[in-house]
Amino acid sequence: MPYVYPEVDELRNKPVAGSGTCVDIIKEYVPGLKGLPTTSWKAGVNVMEAGAKVAKGTAIATFVNGRYPRINTGNHAAIVIKVMPSGIWVMDQWANDKRPTIQLRLITIPPRALQRNSDGSFRNPSNNALAFYVIEK
């Protein structure tokens, strides 16, 4: 079951949620995920494979082996605005961004040579539309 925040458009240029990490926007706004630890998150459908079936306002994230990784960099969570063949428009925030507000951003599909590492894992998953999955519990 996807978790959706229908008022996602209203988040643009609002002050960052919580401490400004990407997961804080999910934990603060998305019903059903508010306040829950990321350890409760599981990977649902791949966003790019599902395409337009992913509703506006759906919470998404990068996952490793079906779980949200607890690492300092290379993982990301956001809220979908629109899925297109070339990428995903999202509302998001991230810890090292100097802007004090939630932003609209396009996460694209990188060129084929830059999509995956030799072990099959996603290269730079935070900026690779292929690496995002719908958040489920």
Q: Where would I find each of the regions flagged by the language model?
A:
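Secreted/periplasmic proteins that engage bacterial cell-wall peptidoglycan
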Residues: M1-A77, K82
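Aromatic- and glycine-rich peptidoglycan recognition patches
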Residues: Y5-N13, I81-K137
